[in-house]
Amino acid sequence: MNSLAGLFITAVFVENLALTFFLGMCTFLAISKKIEVAFGMGIAVIVVQTLTVPINNLVYQYLLRDGALVWAGLAEIDLTFLGLVSYLGVIAAIVQILEMFLDRFMPALHSALGIYLPLIAVNCAILGGSLFMVERDYNFTESLVYGLGSGFGWALAIVALAGVRERLKYSDVPDGLQGLGITFISAGLMAMGFMAFSGIRL
């Protein structure tokens, strides 16, 4: 239990996908103008990440890894070369289901997220979560916790950046830094702040 809690905290703070590995930057910078929209995007990423990482774990364990098909009498077959395509297929399917759900039950949020909702399907932070899961050889429970933690960490980062950007609207930002200029600086300073967690091992 302690190891799972440590894995969650590590995924949120120590190995934050946005501020440590700089994954998902396109969406991270584009959607972080308003806290409400950033929060909605963060929830969407949490849901997608929490679902896709453990599902991709099952795909890897029972279909792709070397010897995974022993249950089908095909122990000598190694399908790991299909990993990237398989993970992207799972992610795209989950995102499509989420988009249909939001369009049906939360049209305002669906409209606010716009083109960036389908772009979650090719968000490198989402794919990165599955690739890290395979690289670190997590089991199903660890994959579930890691997916939740990494999604929560990304959501925390985008909501925090949105809060900073909303405050910056009332600040006297030099003309040359307005817009993405000051946003890059703010994100960089946040990333430096998260470096304080880099030495923690849980």
From Swiss-Prot:
TM region(s), chain numbering: 4-24, 35-55, 81-101, 114-134, 144-164, 180-200
Top enzyme class: translocase
GO molecular function per UniProt: oxidoreductase activity, acting on NAD(P)H, quinone or similar compound as acceptor
Compartments, record wording: Cell inner membrane
Oligomer status and interactors: Composed of six subunits; NqrA, NqrB, NqrC, NqrD, NqrE and NqrF.
Record-linked HAMAP family: NqrE
Family to which the UniProt record says this protein belongs: Belongs to the NqrDE/RnfAE family.
Name of protein: Na(+)-translocating NADH-quinone reductase subunit E
Phylogenetic classification of the source organism: Bacteria, Pseudomonadati, Pseudomonadota, Betaproteobacteria, Nitrosomonadales
